[in-house]
Amino acid sequence: MKILKYTVEDKNNWNEFVKNSKNTHFFFLRDYMEYHSDRFEDFSLMIFDETEKLIAILPANIKEDILYSHQGLTFGGFLVDDKMKTETMLEIFESLKKFIKEQNIEKIVYKCIPYIYHIKPSEEDRYTLFRNDAKLIRRDVTSTIDLTEQVRYSKGRKWTINKAKKELVETFESDDYETFWELLTGVLE
């Protein structure tokens, strides 16, 4: 097993892997991640098996001697291909422990990807964290809306939606992550 630090030359391979992983999310596409390049020192990792096949990636940044599941993202953790098995994830963590020691990294802060984003639900990483005596330092709440079901809005929410319609507010899909991020951070402040 081989672990390599992500470089700009890896962008296409990285993005292709993200699109095909079983626990994917657009957060992990490089254009989205690099929005934070001025705030975080990227230390994303690519993990290859013995046949040189990319089997996992870890969006990450480094600060001092700590490797973080990327701090510029709401969540992170390993993205894996659809053939990932628990035994392989255990091997990845063993390789990762050796790798971080060689890099003089003292600790990893790991944020799991919420299961709702898994195309093929699995939690090899969580099990591996347990097997490695990882310490839980934070637990976040995950809430989802099933868009195939009719949403039942409260009166206040209906009023807000009708007001937005009267103001001709538009909603549409876009790949413009920078503008999305500006809107999102404005709303969350």
Set out the residue ranges of the language-model regions.
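Conserved donor-binding loop and adjoining core beta-sheet/short helix segment
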Residues: 16, 33-100
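Short, internal active-site loops enriched in acidic
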Residues: 113-118, 150
